[in-house]
Amino acid sequence: MTTLRKLPIALAVAAGVLSTQAMAVDFHGYARSGIGWTGSGGEQQCFKTTGAQSKYRLGNECETYAELKLGQELWKEGDKSFYLDTNVAYSVSQRDDWESTDPAFREANVQGKNLIESLPGSTMWAGKRFYQRHDVHMIDFYYWDISGPGAGLEAIDLGFGKLSVAATRNSEAGGSSAWINNQRKDADKTINDVYDIRLAGLETNPGGSLEFGVDYGRANTQDDYSLAPNASKDGVLLTAEHTQSMMGGFNKFVVQYATDSMTSWNSGHSQGTSVNNNGHMLRVIDHGAINLAEKWDMMYVALYQDTDWDNNNGTTWYSVGVRPMYKWTPIMSTLLEAGYDNVKSQRTGDRNGQYKLTLAQQWQAGDSIWSRPAIRVFATYANWDEKWGYNNVDKSPDNGLAQNGTIGTDSRGKSNEVTFGAQFEAWW
């Protein structure tokens, strides 16, 4: 009987412990979804200039997308701790009630803080991770992003700044081959490793700081496998970024230079098996978000990127845009986004241009331009004139090369369109 009396107490204690542990799980993420129409008929179209690496996103997103993050501090003793972080991402076309998709397992890592006595404040980590990503939110453009499986040690306090070192990996389809038993065998995948060194928090002026980074990427073939003779093999990405606190927000000025394998994505990912990316890239970005007045906030971006490839298939991309926000109440606002992209083909010398305007009425959880969740209704107008595109004829020797006109290319020609709809966006 004594044992039976103790059993409910034990179960209650166990339930309490499990409940406490469950409550300690951190749930973070990002999501957006909505519905839209095109003025000429059909579902919402989205508009991106051929040759540009991004588009102005307000009222110009045509998919349902979500990142669901679960994490928990697994152990803590004094200032030492271990934290598990995971992230699964989904993307569907938002055409149907039931839309199945294969999720992307984006993150699964453990971060250990203050594990090295001689390096207080540092974090040791290993696993798949979004690693110190730098982006321009209004065009959804990640200009410094080496995310992937990896390991590193970050935030090493040097007194004048903080040092971080990491190694990450991604892969390319095919890319290398070998002769085995007198037969050619092509690899299904060839991995690329990236080695990253960053020095951040260098104070330059009141409210201002510098960050420098060096990324070296190279293709890493299996034993007995080799790359094509003219493959780029490796490359570097150099980054300098100045961040200035100003007008209730911030401004970031970025200069980047990349070579060879690091010029395909221009973000820190390497494609060393490619024979088409020998050359260099120069990029300059100025972007930020500021408070203009009591009822006015604004995001802005100006970007220049010149990719000069030996095969003359590079581009010069200019982009400039603003997104002012007028706050009628602490939870209701009107936004206007105006953006212009222009991309010149290195091969043809012609240009593709597009300007896009979006007017949105928004209800959001707060009075900042960053406040989310938000529900918005929008109308978008886009006008484009494209003189060139990339050859998209299967098995053509010129497939993937820039050429004039719309026949046999992905050029959109010259046209304009109107779309309208509603969308929610949230992060937490």
Swiss-Prot record:
It is found in: Cell outer membrane. Pfam families: LamB. One of its GO terms (cellular component) is cell outer membrane. The record marks 30, 65, 98, 250, 370, 427 as: Greasy slide, important in sugar transport. Keywords: Cell outer membrane, Ion transport, Membrane, Porin, Signal, Sugar transport, Transmembrane, Transmembrane beta strand, Transport. CDD domains: Maltoporin-like. GO terms for molecular function: maltodextrin transmembrane transporter activity; maltose transporting porin activity. Its main location: membrane. Induction: By maltose. It catalyses: beta-maltose(in) = beta-maltose(out). One of its GO terms (biological process) is monoatomic ion transport. The keyword Signal applies. Belongs to the porin LamB (TC 1.B.3) family. Involved in the transport of maltose and maltodextrins. Homotrimer formed of three 18-stranded antiparallel beta-barrels, containing three independent channels. This is Maltoporin. It comes from Yersinia enterocolitica serotype O:8 / biotype 1B (strain NCTC 13174 / 8081).
